[in-house]
Structure formats: C-alpha cells, structure tokens
Design a protein with these regions (language model features):
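Residue-level hotspots at or immediately adjacent to binding/recognition sites across diverse folds
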Residues: 1-154
Length: 154
C-alpha cells in the first residue's frame, strides 16, 4: 500500500491493483491494473510523482502521478523475486531474493548486489539513507543504491 498525490494504491496477487481517493471506495486503474498478471505484486511505493510496483520474477511497473496507466519496465538480468521498494535521493530501490534493483530518474535499470548471498525482505528510506533488511539479522545501508555497507548481521 502506498499514498501519493492524494491517492491510495494497493497491489497484490495476480497483478491486482486498486486505487482510492478516500481509502474506502476503490477502483481498478487502467493499464496493468485492469488485467490479470501471472505475477504477485509484493510492494509499491510513491516518489517523483510516480508509483512503482515490484513483484515476483523481478517484476517492475511504473505509473504516472494519477495512479492510472501502469507500464511494465524491463526486468534486469539477474533480478529475482522483489519484495519491497523505496524512493529517495531521486532513485527507486527495489529489494528481494539475491537482488537489489535501482531505477533512477533517467529511467535506467541497473541490478546491484544480484550475486549477494542474502535475501533482502524490506527496504526503506530516511535521513538520506536506504536501509535494507533480510535474513540472518542482516542490515545494509546505502545512499545511492549502488554502494551498500553491511552494518549488522551474521
């Protein structure tokens, strides 16, 4: 679930996407939201006047500021299941199984840490830093989505 430009947007199984202006009355947006996908959408975030969804098999899709008209993005080589996404410092960062994917303001997708032995389950952004967490109590931080530092874990 994400909120941006006065809209709530939720995502889920089989590519389901729902949009609401008030948090109760929902509708299905056009584009990806209006059809069934063979992908589970695990996470969604808002940034740079866009919503980004992430899901199974490295699935990524982006929308305009109104939450309508989702468009599939090219899945980077090596990207696996993605579970969470965050926006900060003019980039989107998505994390998942052995995968960190960066979608920057120029629209380029670059897989980062795709060979990492850890599976990241969640990512957030605050105070100028991305923080990704995963199995075995690992925590990594990054300011640019490219260079990651392990700050905790086994």
């Amino acid at each position: 679930m994400a909120f941006g430009n006065n809209k709530f947007i939720g995502s889920g199984e089989e590519g389901a996407i729902q949009i609401s202006d008030n948090g109760s009355a929902c509708s299905t947006p056009t584009g990806l939201g209006s059809r069934t996908l063979e992908k589970t959408l695990n996470g969604i975030t808002f940034g740079n006047n866009q919503f980004l969804t992430v899901g199974s098999d490295g699935w990524l899709s982006i929308t305009s500021d109104d939450g309508d008209g989702f468009t599939a993005l090219t899945i980077p080589t090596g990207a696996k299941h993605l579970y969470s996404t965050a926006y900060g410092n003019d980039i989107f960062v998505a994390v998942g199984d052995d995968s960190v994917v960066v979608y920057d303001k120029d629209g380029l997708l670059d897989p980062v840490l795709k060979a990492n032995k850890y599976s990241f389950n969640d990512v957030t952004f605050g105070n100028g830093v991305f923080v990704a967490v995963g199995n075995d109590e690992i925590i990594y931080t990054s300011t640019d989505g490219d260079d990651w530092t392990q700050v905790h874990g086994k």
